[in-house]
Amino acid sequence: MKSILSFSVLMVALTFCGIGERLRQVGSSNSNSSTSNSSTKSTSGESDAEKPSLTGAQQVIQDSATEVKWPDQGISWKLPAGWPKMDVKKESFNYGSPANGFLIASISTMPDSFPSDISLKATYDQALEQLKQGKYEKVRWLDLDGVKGVEWVEAPPETKDGIRRHQWIGFRNYQGQNQQLNIILSTDGEKFNKQEDAFAAILYSMKIPKA
């Protein structure tokens, strides 16, 4: 369990690796062009973000799940049986078990001046690059409860006990704060296929207040 949490914390850190360069590149591109297409439009809109669509198996899991709330943030998910509470703080939320997987959510509060749209576009571009390199098997814009973000699923790890993740990153304005939301569902690579429907059902059940 500690190994999975350590790897997940590392992934949060790696999310920001090279992000400064991506921000500069996207910012430069935006300043030099007055036109846009599907790869460069502002991430504040929702037109280019898909909405979750559950399979039959995922719907069954979600229908039988129990809602769990993150009191300090107002966010909630529906969790199946076997996903106990581990640790919940103001900016972190951890539920799960080695048998089924882990839900690891974190909040990062950004300055009001932080370019959230540009940052999210850079995250998307970086994820597409990982997709090209075979490190991710799925990348898309995904709207969760009215919040646009980037969703990706990692490719199988080289070893069976390596960590594999289903992840989503987005931004919201909440109680006067500009917040980055980082949601990770993870388990060992050999268990991922068995849990992937549960991971999707959990992620897509997310309710995100904006105020």
Regions found by a protein language model. Give the residues of each.
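N-terminal targeting sequences that direct proteins away from the cytosol to non-cytosolic compartments
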Residues: 5-8, 15-102, 162-163, 177, ...
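A short, sequence-level motif marking secondary-structure junctions
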Residues: 82-85, 108-113, 170-173
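A short acidic-to-branched-hydrophobic micro-motif
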Residues: 96-122
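Second-shell loop/turn segments in exported
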Residues: 108-114, 139, 188-192
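Signature of long, low-cysteine stretches enriched in small and polar/charged residues
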Residues: 125-176
